[in-house]
Structures are given as structure tokens and as C-alpha cells.
Regions:
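Residue-level detector of functionally special positions within alpha-helical transmembrane segments
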Residues: 49, 86-87, 142, 203
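Glycine-rich nucleotide phosphate-binding loop and flanking beta-alpha elements
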Residues: 52-53, 89-91, 147, 171
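N-terminal beta1-alpha1 cap of cysteine-dependent amidohydrolase-like domains
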Residues: 1-85, 92-99, 105-111, 118, ...
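Short, flexible active-site-adjacent loop segments at beta-strand->alpha-helix junctions, enriched
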Residues: 88-89, 123
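Amide-donor transfer/coupling interface in amidating biosynthetic enzymes
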Residues: 73-77, 102-229
């Protein structure tokens, strides 16, 4: 199994992802620089968190114009597995691989804390090792995580079960209090219609080892391996 982790100027979570893939779940992994023109031999692309290009213009906007982003789009169109975490999620929306946009947090502040999220769809390649409606605790760290889309788009993704994760309390109840950024319907992560592209704001790579106090995030990566095998 070969994972490719994209590196943009300003990315800062690629090493965490690399460690989890290489040292925790023991899969082949390599970095792919933003001006590369090939994803040859890659089974799963990870677009990590950070501040690509300093978040200038708009989060993810400049990264979406890079050479590797064209390759990511083509890879996804062929059915390749793609996951975007935090800034990676923002980039995937800029690439139109996922619907909607990520706006400034409702509080207008950078938010860095643990959040509870509910598994809304456990039948995907990203969540098949989680139980349906399970509640896991995953940290967030972002200023633009306020997910928004039109009413028509929202109706569509609900009908197609594209909502994968939602913010909730420790009992699995969604509320405004449990929503850290103002995201519509408390959405924390969703997939494309085909189910091969996932974007989420929480950082599963930061809770994938016991030494970090939790392994709630590891099953996301293991689910991908399980599916692709």
C-alpha cells in the first residue's frame, strides 16, 4: 500500500501524517512536492493541514493552482482515494472535488481544542472500522473551519449520505454549543458523491497513538488500508 503526502509551502502537518502511516500502521509512504507532475504508484493521497502559501487570498486558493493539484483532480476522477485534513479540506473544496466552502469561524477566532465528532456514515472506505453513530474525540486547530453550502447542495449531500462526521457532545448530541466554528448542520467532514474523496477539519493523525493519549483517529487510516487491500 503506497500513500503519498502532498507538501505545499506552508504545510505543517505532513510529518505527523507520515509518522502515522509509516511507523504506526506500517505502510509505504512518501512526500510529494507541490510542483510534481506525477502520482504514479500512489494508492492514497493525503493533503495535510497547515497554512499553504500563508493562506493568502483565501485558504487553499493558491494551492489549488499548483501543478500537483491538477494531478490530484485527475487521480480523484479515476476513483483514487483522497483525504484532505484541515487545510487539505479547504484545498479540496477549492478544487471542486468537494462541495461547499470553508469560511471564517463564527467566533472570528482561531480555535484549537479537542472536539467530539459523531460517525454519521460508517459504510465508507474511510470509516468502515468505526461503529455507526460512534462518538470519537479528535482535536481541531483552524481559523476557517466554518463549513457552508447552499440549501440545494445541503439537501443533495444529505440524500446521498455524504456527511461523514458531525460535531457533537460526548453523548453524540448535536447542538450549537458543540459546534466549534459555526459549520452548517455541525458538519465536520464529508465525502464526494462517489465516496472516494474525504475532507474533514479535525486532525485524526494527532490521536493515533497511545502515547498521545488517544487512538480515536487511527481507524480512519486503517479503514483506508482495509478497503484498498
Amino acid at each position: 500500500m503506497n500513500f503519498g503526502i502532498i507538501q505545499f509551502p506552508g504545510s505543517n502537518c505532513e510529518q505527523d501524517c507520515f509518522h502515522v502511516i509509516s511507523n504506526v500502521i506500517k505502510q509505504n509512504c512518501r512526500y510529494i512536492w507541490h510542483d510534481s507532475k506525477s502520482l504514479r504508484g500512489i494508492d492514497c493521497v493525503i493533503v495535510p493541514g497547515g497554512f499553504s502559501y500563508g493562506d493568502y487570498l483565501r485558504t487553499g486558493a493558491i494551492a489549488a493552482q499548483s501543478k500537483i493539484s491538477y494531478e490530484i483532480k485527475e487521480f480523484a476522477k479515476r476513483g483514487g482515494t483522497v483525504i484532505g485534513i484541515c487545510n487539505g479540506f479547504q484545498i479540496l473544496t477549492e478544487l471542486k472535488l468537494l462541495p461547499g466552502v470553508l469560511l471564517r469561524n463564527k467566533s472570528l477566532n482561531f480555535v484549537c481544542k479537542d472536539t467530539y465528532i459523531k460517525i454519521e456514515n460508517s459504510s465508507t472506505r474511510f470509516t468502515q472500522l468505526y461503529n455507526q453513530d460512534a462518538v470519537i474525540k479528535i482535536p481541531i486547530a483552524h481559523a476557517e473551519g466554518n463549513y457552508y453550502l447552499t440549501k440545494k447542495e445541503l439537501s443533495t449531500i444529505r440524500k446521498r449520505n455524504q456527511i461523514i462526521f458531525s460535531y457533537c457532545d460526548e453523548f453524540g448530541i448535536s447542538s450549537e454549543t458543540a459546534n466549534p466554528n459555526g459549520s452548517i448542520l455541525n458538519i465536520a467532514g464529508l465525502s464526494n458523491e462517489e465516496g472516494n474523496v474525504l475532507g474533514l477539519m479535525p486532525h485524526p493523525e494527532r490521536v493515533s497513538e497511545n502515547i498521545l493519549g488517544s487512538t480515536d483517529g487511527i481507524n480512519l487510516f486503517k479503514s483506508i488500508v482495509n478497503f484498498l487491500n
